[in-house]
C-alpha cells in the first residue's frame, strides 16, 4: 500500500475489566444530553426573575428588554436571563474544576502517581467519572483525562455566551445543566484526589469528632488560620508543625471548606508519606459567615488564604489589626508581592516586623513553613495591637451613644436585623439583643459602610459577645467521604419503595435568612423523622454550634452512617459529589442499572424512584448555583433560601397541567399520568418552615409503594400541622389508595376526598371507587426515556 498513514491511539482494555458494555454517551458534549435537559425544562417550567430590564454585555447596549422588546443582537429577556444564569453556573464550575486541576498537579508533584483505591467496601469507586466518561480510574493520573474533558466542555459552553451565539432560553438552560454536570465531575475529581493522596476517610461512619468554634483556638499559642477551599498549603503547615514538634506553640484552625479538609488528613492508618492521624490536630474555626467576626475578635495571628469564598478585603481587615496574610494560590493574590522564590527566613522577617502586610507564596511547602514560623514569632508582637483593636467598656458605651437611630443599617442588612433598636437597648444596659442576633448576622459589614456615624457595628458585636466567643467550643464529625456500597445495599430497597422517607442533603454557604440555628433545626427535624440526613460545607459546620439539653451537638446525638435516623458529614464543598454518587449507586447497586456512560438513564431512575432533596439554605455563591444545577440534571430537586431569587431562575412544576406529568410505563410502553412527584426542581422558600414542608414533599416519587407513600404523606402532613396548623392544600394529589393515607388523618381525609374533591368511596370496604389519578401499582415502572421500554403492547 502506498500513501497510507495508520494512526494508533490509546489501546483500550476497559471491556475486559468491566462487566458493563459501553453506554450510549461517553464524554457527552454540549448537545449530547439536550433531549434529557428539555424533558426537565418542559416539565419544570423555567421562571426568571431578572435583576434589571436591560442588557449591557456589548457596545450596542444598553438595550431595553421590557415587554416583547429585543436587544440589538436579537436577544429577548428570557434568553438574556438564561445567558446570565449560564455565566454564573460556569463561574462555579470553573472554580471547582480549576481547584481539581491545581490538586492534580500538586498531588502528582508531591506524592507521585498512586493507585486509586477507595477501600474494600467501595467497588463503585468514582460514580460520576464512570457515568460520564464511561471509564474507571486506576490511578491518580487517570483523573487528568477527566480534567481535560471538563476543561474542553467549559470552553465550548463559555463560547456560547458570546454575543451573536446562543439565542434561545431553553438552550441556555440545557447548557447550564451541562455545566452543572461538569461541575459535579470536577468536584468528584477534587475529593478523590485528596482522599487518596492525603489518606482521608473512605466512607467512615465513625469518623472522629473534631473541635469547632472560635473558643477552641488556644490564645496562649500562635494561631494560624487557613482560609478557603484548597487544603494544599494548610496541610503543609500542619506537616511542618508535626515534623518540628511545634504543637505546643501553635494552633491551626480553618475557615470555610479548608477547615473541614484539614481535619480529614491521614485518618485511616494506611501507609502514607504524611504523619499519621494528623487531621484531628487541626480545629475548625468556623464557616465563611463567621470570618469577619473572627477578625474583629482578634483570634488569629497569621492567615493563609488559598482559593474560593475568601472575602476580597481580607488583607485590609487583617492589616488594620497587624495580622500577616499569606496568599498561597494564584487565584487570590490580593496585590501582594510574589515572594515564592525568596528565602523563608527573609519572608518571615518581613512579616514579623510588619514591613509587609502580606506576601504571595505559590509553593505550598514554603507557604506552610512561613505561615507557622510567622504565627509563632508574631504572637508576642501582636499583643499590644490586639488590645488596641478591641473595645473597652467605655469605648463600647461611647460608640453606642453616637447612634442617631436613623435605621439606614437595618435597610441594608440581609437578615433585616433591627440594629438601631439593638443599640438603643444596649444603652439601657440590655445586651441580650446583641447576643441573640450574633449568629443571625452574616458578617457582610454593609451596616458599617452605610452608617453616617461610621459606627463599627461588628466591633460592638464582638464586645457584647466576648464571653460567648471564648466559650464557643463544640464538636463536629470530620468529613467521612463517600457512601459505602454496603450502605447502599442496606438502604436501596427501603429508599426506592419509600419506607425510608428520603435523603435530605444540607449543603452550601452561610448566607442564611435568619441565622445558623436554622441549619440545626432543619437537620434535627428530618433526622428525628427517620430520613437519611447528609451535610457538607458551611451547613455542616454551622449546625455544629448548638447542643441539646444533654450538652451534645447534633453529631454526638446521632450516628454517622448513611441510614435512616443518622446524620453524615460527607465533607467539604467538593464532597458534594458523593451525594450524586450515592444516588447513582442506588441505581447501579440496588437496581442493577448500568451506569457506564449512561447518564440520562441514571438521572431518569433517580428522578423517578430515589426520594431525595437538597437544601442550600445559605446559598450565596456561583458555586452554589453550579452545585444545585448539577444536582438538578441528575434528577434531584433543591430548595434554596429567599435571597436566591438573585440567581434569576427557578424550575417549577405546574400541577394544573396534566400533560406535563405524563410518563412511560417501561414494562409495556403505555403512557401514564402521575402525581406531581417531585413537584419542582429548584424551589425558593421564604422561611425555614416553608422549606421543610417543601423538602418533605419533594421526596415523593412515583415508585413509592403504599407503605412508603403513607410514611411520606404522614411526614408531609405532620410538618404542615406542626408549623402551619393545617393539612397542606395539595395532599390529595399524592393519594392513590386508602392505604396511602396516614392513619392519624385517615377518616378526616376520606371525608374531605368525598365531600370536597368528589371522590367516590366504598366506606364499608374502605376502597376508592373513583378519584385517584392512578391506582397504586407495585409493578409500575415509570421512565421518561423511550429506550427503556421492555415490551410494547
From Swiss-Prot:
Domain of life, per lineage: Archaea
The protein's Enzyme Commission number: 1.2.7.4
Binding, [4Fe-4S] cluster 2: 55, 58, 63, 73
Entry binding sites for [4Fe-4S] cluster 4: 413, 441, 444, 447
Protein name: Acetyl-CoA decarbonylase/synthase complex subunit alpha
Organism: Methanothrix soehngenii
Keywords of the record: 4Fe-4S, Iron, Iron-sulfur, Metal-binding, Nickel, Oxidoreductase, Repeat
NCBIfam families xrefs: cdhA
Domain 4Fe-4S ferredoxin-type positions: 393-422, 432-461
Cofactor annotation comment: Binds 6 [4Fe-4S] clusters per heterotetramer. Binds 2 [Ni-4Fe-4S] clusters per heterotetramer.
Amino acid at each position: 500500500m502506498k500513501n497510507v498513514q495508520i494512526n494508533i491511539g490509546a489501546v483500550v482494555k476497559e471491556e475486559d475489566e468491566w462487566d458493563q458494555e459501553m453506554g450510549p454517551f461517553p464524554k457527552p458534549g454540549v448537545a449530547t444530553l439536550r433531549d434529557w435537559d428539555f424533558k426537565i425544562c418542559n416539565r419544570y417550567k423555567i421562571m426568571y426573575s431578572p435583576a434589571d430590564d436591560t442588557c449591557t454585555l456589548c457596545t450596542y447596549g444598553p438595550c431595553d428588554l421590557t415587554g416583547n422588546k429585543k436587544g440589538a443582537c436579537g436577544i429577548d429577556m428570557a434568553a438574556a436571563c438564561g445567558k446570565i444564569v449560564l455565566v454564573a453556573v460556569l463561574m462555579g464550575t470553573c472554580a471547582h474544576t480549576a481547584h481539581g486541576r491545581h490538586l492534580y498537579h500538586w498531588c502528582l508533584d508531591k506524592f507521585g502517581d498512586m493507585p486509586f483505591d477507595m477501600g474494600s467496601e467501595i467497588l463503585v469507586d468514582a460514580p460520576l467519572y464512570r457515568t460520564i466518561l464511561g471509564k474507571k480510574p486506576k490511578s491518580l493520573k487517570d483523573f487528568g483525562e477527566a480534567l481535560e474533558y471538563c476543561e474542553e466542555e467549559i470552553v465550548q459552553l463559555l463560547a456560547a455566551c458570546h454575543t451573536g451565539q446562543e439565542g434561545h432560553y431553553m438552550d441556555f438552560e440545557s447548557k447550564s445543566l451541562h455545566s452543572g454536570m461538569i461541575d459535579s465531575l470536577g468536584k468528584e475529581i477534587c475529593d478523590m484526589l485528596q482522599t487518596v493522596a492525603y489518606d482521608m476517610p473512605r466512607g467512615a461512619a465513625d469518623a472522629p469528632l473534631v473541635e469547632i468554634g472560635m473558643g477552641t483556638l488556644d490564645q496562649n499559642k500562635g494561631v494560624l488560620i487557613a482560609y478557603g477551599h484548597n487544603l494544599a498549603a494548610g496541610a503543609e503547615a500542619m506537616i511542618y508543625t508535626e515534623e518540628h514538634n511545634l504543637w505546643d506553640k501553635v494552633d491551626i484552625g480553618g475557615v470555610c471548606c479548608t477547615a473541614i479538609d484539614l481535619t480529614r488528613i491521614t485518618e485511616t492508618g494506611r501507609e502514607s508519606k504524611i504523619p499519621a492521624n494528623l487531621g484531628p490536630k487541626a480545629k475548625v474555626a468556623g464557616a465563611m459567615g463567621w470570618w469577619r467576626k473572627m477578625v474583629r475578635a482578634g483570634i488569629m495571628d497569621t492567615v493563609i488564604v488559598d482559593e474560593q469564598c475568601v472575602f476580597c478585603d481580607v488583607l485590609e481587615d487583617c492589616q488594620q489589626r497587624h495580622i500577616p496574610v499569606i496568599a498561597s494560590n494564584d487565584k487570590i493574590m490580593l496585590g501582594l508581592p510574589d515572594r515564592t522564590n525568596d528565602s523563608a527566613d527573609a519572608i518571615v522577617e518581613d512579616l514579623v516586623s510588619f514591613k509587609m502586610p502580606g506576601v504571595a507564596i505559590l509553593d505550598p511547602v514554603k507557604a506552610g513553613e512561613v505561615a507557622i514560623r510567622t504565627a509563632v514569632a508574631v504572637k508576642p508582637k501582636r499583643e499590644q495591637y490586639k488590645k488596641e483593636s478591641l473595645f473597652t467598656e467605655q469605648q463600647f458605651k461611647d460608640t453606642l451613644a453616637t447612634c442617631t437611630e436613623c435605621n439606614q443599617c437595618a435597610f441594608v442588612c440581609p437578615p433585616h436585623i433591627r440594629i438601631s433598636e439593638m443599640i438603643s437597648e444596649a444603652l439601657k444596659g440590655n445586651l441580650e439583643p446583641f447576643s441573640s442576633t450574633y449568629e443571625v448576622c452574616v458578617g457582610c459589614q454593609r451596616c458599617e459602610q452605610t452608617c453616617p456615624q461610621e459606627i463599627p457595628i461588628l466591633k460592638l458585636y464582638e464586645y457584647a459577645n466576648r464571653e460567648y466567643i471564648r466559650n464557643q467550643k463544640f464538636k463536629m464529625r470530620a468529613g467521612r467521604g463517600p457512601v459505602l456500597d454496603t450502605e447502599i445495599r442496606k438502604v436501596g430497597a427501603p429508599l426506592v419503595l419509600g419506607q425510608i422517607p428520603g435523603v435530605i442533603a444540607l449543603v452550601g454557604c452561610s448566607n442564611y435568612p435568619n441565622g445558623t440555628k436554622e441549619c440545626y433545626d432543619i437537620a434535627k427535624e428530618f433526622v428525628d423523622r427517620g430520613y437519611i440526613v447528609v451535610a457538607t460545607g458551611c451547613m455542616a459546620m454551622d449546625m455544629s454550634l448548638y447542643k441539646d439539653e444533654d450538652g451534645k451537638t447534633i453529631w454526638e446525638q446521632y450516628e454517622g452512617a448513611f441510614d435512616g435516623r443518622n446524620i453524615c458529614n460527607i465533607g467539604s464543598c467538593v464532597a458534594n459529589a458523593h451525594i450524586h454518587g450515592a444516588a447513582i449507586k442506588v441505581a447501579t447497586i440496588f437496581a442493577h442499572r448500568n451506569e457506564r456512560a449512561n447518564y440520562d438513564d441514571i438521572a431518569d431512575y433517580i428522578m423517578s424512584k430515589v426520594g431525595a432533596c437538597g437544601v442550600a439554605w445559605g446559598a450565596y455563591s456561583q458555586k452554589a448555583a453550579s452545585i444545585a444545577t448539577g444536582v438538578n440534571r441528575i434528577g434531584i430537586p433543591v430548595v434554596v433560601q429567599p435571597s436566591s431569587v438573585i440567581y434569576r431562575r427557578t424550575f417549577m412544576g405546574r400541577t394544573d397541567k396534566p400533560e406535563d406529568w405524563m410518563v412511560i410505563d417501561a414494562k409495556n410502553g403505555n403512557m401514564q399520568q402521575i402525581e406531581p412527584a417531585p413537584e419542582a426542581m429548584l424551589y425558593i422558600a421564604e422561611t425555614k418552615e416553608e422549606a421543610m414542608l417543601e423538602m418533605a414533599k419533594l421526596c415523593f416519587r412515583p415508585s413509592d409503594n403504599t407503605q412508603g407513600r403513607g410514611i411520606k404523606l404522614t411526614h408531609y402532613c405532620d410538618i404542615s400541622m406542626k408549623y402551619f396548623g393545617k393539612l397542606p392544600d395539595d395532599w390529595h394529589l399524592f393519594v392513590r389508595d386508602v392505604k396511602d393515607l396516614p392513619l392519624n388523618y385517615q377518616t378526616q381525609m376520606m371525608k374531605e376526598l368525598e365531600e370536597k374533591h368528589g371522590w367516590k368511596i366504598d366506606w364499608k370496604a374502605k376502597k376508592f371507587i373513583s378519584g385517584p389519578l392512578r391506582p397504586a401499582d407495585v409493578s409500575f415502572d415509570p421512565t421518561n426515556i423511550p429506550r427503556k421500554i421492555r415490551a410494547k403492547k
